[in-house]
Amino acid sequence: MGTDNKSKVEARASARYFKMSANKARRVINQIRGRSYEQALILLEFMPYRACYAILQLISSAAANANHNLGLSRANPFISEAKVDESTLFKRFQPRAQGRGYPIHKPTCHITITMIEKT
């Protein structure tokens, strides 16, 4: 029932307005959530999705933030939180026959990675 007042040292990195639907990014994020830094890099290297490269860069950025800002080693961080939130839609129109225009919605999302050191 008591609350734990220990403050966890965590490093975070986020990509905002990433031009991909949230569902496609979640497909990749769900595979790496809770894994170690090395395991996540190996998984992302061999997954065939377009979101993998951006998430790989984001994980590398979070590890660099942990190393530079908090002094944590790169040997044993793991991904404690990984989330994808929907963002705004970019609305465009595709010209069609006889003066019509069809709406095109280009979805974006926000990706956030939080890493802590595994003890």
Swiss-Prot record:
GO terms for molecular function: rRNA binding; structural constituent of ribosome. Gene3D superfamilies: Ribosomal protein L22/L17 (3.90.470.10). This is Large ribosomal subunit protein uL22c. This protein binds specifically to 23S rRNA. InterPro entries: Ribosomal_uL22, Ribosomal_uL22_bac/chlpt-type, Ribosomal_uL22_bac/org-type, Ribosomal_uL22_CS, Ribosomal_uL22_sf. Pfam families: Ribosomal_L22. Belongs to the universal ribosomal protein uL22 family. Keywords: Chloroplast, Plastid, Ribonucleoprotein, Ribosomal protein, RNA-binding, rRNA-binding. One of its GO terms (biological process) is translation. The lineage of its organism: Eukaryota, Viridiplantae, Streptophyta, Embryophyta, Tracheophyta. GO terms for cellular component: chloroplast; large ribosomal subunit. It comes from the Eukaryota. It is found in: Plastid, Chloroplast.
